[in-house]
Amino acid sequence: IAGETMAADIKRGLGRREPDMDVVKAEIARAEAPFATKPGDSNRIRDTLLDLMWDDVGIIRDKAGMTRALGRLDDLSGGLAAAGVPDGDRRFNLSWSDWLNLRSQIEISKVIAHAALKRENSRGAHFRTDFPESGPLEPKAVTEE
């Protein structure tokens, strides 16, 4: 599907845009941020994230648990920002790669918790004890803030 869309865009003359260098520079700075901080224990943060998501945002969830999880996810973000990686060779740097992956996992965990809070029903692998009914199945649903 993506390939067909790209081909159609090219035929219409949409081509490609030049990258916004301010955005590129900001993302490089964000990616390199852990080198400016004293190395810390990201493994403990990862273990806490796994337990938190299972306990409060797992298959069986409720508003109280997901709200609690969102607060703790903010704490984990802060903890990760304070736990840098050793500054050295940046090629094949597994510590840096793990740190970046963990940051992404925390960000995606926040998205999952926010989206699950918006759903006031239970279906499939999403069961809310405070909304146990499945409710009507909409042909298409969009979750908006």
What are these regions (language model features)?
Residues I1-E145:
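Glycine- and aromatic-enriched mobile tails/lids
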